[in-house]
Swiss-Prot record:
Underlying gene: ERF027
Biological source species: Arabidopsis thaliana
MF (Gene Ontology): DNA-binding transcription factor activity; transcription cis-regulatory region binding
Gene3D superfamilies attached to this UniProt entry: AP2/ERF domain
GO cellular component terms listed in the entry, alphabetical order: nucleus
Protein name, as recorded: Ethylene-responsive transcription factor ERF027
Domain of life (superkingdom): Eukaryota
CDD domains reported in the protein's UniProt record: AP2
Compositional bias per record (Acidic residues), positions renumbered to this chain: 179-192
Length: 192
């Protein structure tokens, strides 16, 4: 069995949708993109759905690579917000807005599918909206919070690595430990 057949077999067993620029971490979908001709990456956020993370990647790819970008949802290009500049903050803000819009679309599609299956169930629809401010974005009743940014994970890992390079503290003289024979006051605990 050659390697191309083996890789094709593995790919056909996957249940997760495969999109560019995203991966699943702890049950949530994260998105990031490498800046062209640089080694740095722009963190785009953590999302509850793969489609939302993929939409965030699409906006960043369009902003950084232009028409040459390979997109996850090429049919949605016209509806995506355009970042004000190519700065990481502007790209991140536009990516979050696109993810919020994609979350509303996915939520509405799921709702319509459920209504078709059970026409007797009456569920109250929530209105989806996206503001230009990333902090006030919301989608279908769920709230976005970038845990990586809140917990400062990239710096946390760097600080932990630096801590391993620090020399351990030296002991100030050698004090006898509490369980040494010199510190026992001639009492034998196990004397019968």
């Amino acid at each position: 069995m050659n390697s191309s057949m083996a890789s094709a077999g593995l790919g056909s067993r996957r249940k997760d949708p495969v999109y560019r620029g995203i991966r699943c971490r702890s049950g949530k979908w994260v998105s990031e993109i490498r800046e062209p001709r640089k080694t740095t990456r722009i963190w785009l956020g953590t999302y509850p759905m793969a489609e939302m993370a993929a939409a965030a990647y699409d906006v960043a790819a369009m902003a950084l690579k232009g028409r040459e970008a390979v997109l996850n949802f090429p049919g949605s290009v016209g509806s995506y917000p355009v970042p004000e500049s190519t700065s990481a903050a502007d790209i991140r803000a536009a990516a979050a807005a696109a993810a919020a819009m994609k979350g509303c679309e996915e939520g509405e599609e799921e709702k319509k599918a459920k209504e078709k299956k059970s026409s007797s169930s009456k569920s109250r629809a929530r209105e989806c909206h996206v503001d230009n401010d990333v902090g006030s974005s919301s989608w279908c009743g769920t709230e976005f919070m970038d845990e990586e940014e809140v917990l400062n994970m990239p710096n946390l890992l760097a600080n932990m690595a630096e801590g391993m390079m620090v020399a351990p503290p030296s002991w100030m003289g050698s004090r006898p430990s509490d369980d040494s024979p010199e510190n026992s006051n001639d009492e034998d605990l196990w004397g019968y």
